[in-house]
Amino acid sequence: MTTKPESRLLSFADRGPVAKSYKKYFAKASLTFFAAMILGVFLLPLLYMVDTSLQHPDQRTVAGSPVYPAVARQGTYQGNTYPIYVVPMPDGSTKEMMLVEPGRVQSTFVDPNDASQTPVEWQGSWRTLSQAWSFNIDFDNFTTVWSQLNFPRMLFNTAAIAILSTIAAVISGCLVAYGFARFRFPGKNMMFVVLLATIILPFQVTLIPTYIIFTRIGWSGTWLPLIIPHLFANAFNVFLLRQYFLSIPRDLDEAAMIDGASPFRILRSVILPMSVPAITAVTLFHFFFSWNDFFLPLLYLQSKPELQTLPVAIQAYNQLYVSEPTLIQAAALMTMAVPVVVFFLAQGAFMRTVVITGVEK
């Protein structure tokens, strides 16, 4: 009795899961590729900054120099130093040779690996040849910026202003957000709407009035205009903290009140310990804003160079060394080092908080 051979073709029902798995894999691969492309676009300026800051200043002035940090190769012949070029050989290959006697029609080269050999006469203009380069990282740009820019002083100014203003912003934001989240008083909702409306208020609208006020009270030329205004809560910080405070059950407040805790004690012992992710996010947001702020320090500290921050100092440094991109990029890279380190140390709490909504947990 003969049996019918089993068909190797998958039925429609069998092909369904396979097709779905391939479709799911293709969707994930496409999403990953698209995300990598976007990431590359954002990382390209950073890669340019790192690459340029590690190059020797002379490399930027040589035509045909590589994009990576490198130094032009040189060799010694009879006690003198000569550049090395990539020379085409008669057999079609290329070889690195040391140019000892340049000429328009004929040039003399010597093998840099064996200078005792007879010099080679090459027919052609040496200017058409490519110079030989070797990978080389130059850290002198950072030491130059450190000394010329008075970097330690500018770093101290920037850190002091950023830390003090961040402390002021976090304290004021927590107090105001706690009032909107836990207390009942007439006009609370209207006041909160007005507070949120200040987010869309252009910065230029309040710039001139605040500048006139701070100048008349003698704050111009000091750090006070960069710190004191943050004692009056920022609307964005209040909104973010209030939404998080609302997600904390009121039962905890009532339990603390039964034990005799005051409203301030509830804030300090119940609300704040449970709101570490939100407070961390507000701290990072404001710290980065204050660290990168350029206009306000320029406006209020222009008469006091010793009190200026790094962004303002880098702008002045750029005007002096506009033809030295390696120094400018080194200064920018050194300036962004602190925010990058701070972000990576607190990225866990930060990423948990950026998705906060008004929905209770």
Predicted regions and their residues:
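Anchoring transmembrane alpha helix of integral membrane proteins
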Residues: 13-14, 30
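A structural signal for multi-pass alpha-helical bundles of membrane permease subunits
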Residues: 3-9, 19, 23, 31, ...
